[in-house]
Amino acid sequence: MKLGLTCPRFTWPGGDSAIAGRFAAAARGADGAGLHSLWVMDHFFQIPNFGAVEDPMLEAYGALSYAAALTSRVTLGALVTGAVHREPGLLVKQVSTLDALSGGRAVLGIGAGWYEPEARGLGLRFPSLAERFERLEETLQIARQMWSDEDKPYEGRHYRLERTLNAPQARPPILIGGSGENKTLRLVAEYADACNFLHGADVRHKLGVLRAHCERLGRPYEEIEKTLHMRIPDGQSVAESVQRCGDLAALGIDHVIVAVPDAAADSSLAHLAALATQISAITPAGR
């Protein structure tokens, strides 16, 4: 079983001037602790679950590029990018650049997008849910085309590209976040290398739905990495964290991505190092 760290907050003692140093400590700490992955949210305003809207929030791909320069092992991705916030060609180029500069460690984490206040606040496109899913699917199609030898036009309902040239070439894994049964999990089965659920989802049921989509499409279910995001609260012991991860592995989760109260704290990184070591011996169900 794999362990990842997400950094959803950039609020540290010392204010804005402390962000670079503390985020660097989190990135280096995750890399040195034996974690598999490092993630940031792709938000422009802080979201309600993690703080006040006015709290500091870094742009995802700038932050990930900074982390890439400080690390050598962890994979790097946004958990997850709202597909409607960037033109698909630009997004694919950003992730391809991250992949090139990190030595092949980028992941495209993507979803339909949901946080309307930041979109309205910054004047970004925020169409209906149905259209956001249409744009997400077209973005996935464009990514696959740009990460192939098909240097040709793309024409969809919402996006038209005259030439899907992408050099340097890349093929980062695609992770789709969300648990919607009719649309999201169908897109996972058709386009993705990994899925991501939030803690609290009915994992057993959702994985059954995903398996059914895979069977219908002729996709091997085992090809897809199953990931889940959860929080580790203050005071939780390593043994308790191991138990939680083990319970998820028994359901078929391959990779747990955790948020901790302070991703740069020595105590948090020590907890994660111990957790990563212990769960590395766990084989998820179906593997």
Language-model-derived ranges and their functions:
Residues 1-70, 172, 200-201, 266, ...:
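N-terminal beta1-alpha1-beta2 module of alpha/beta enzyme domains
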Residues 31-32, 64-73, 95, 99-105, ...:
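Acidic (Asp/Glu)-rich catalytic clusters
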Residues 3-7, 38-40, 75-78, 106-110, ...:
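Hydrophobic faces of well-ordered beta-strands that scaffold small-molecule active sites
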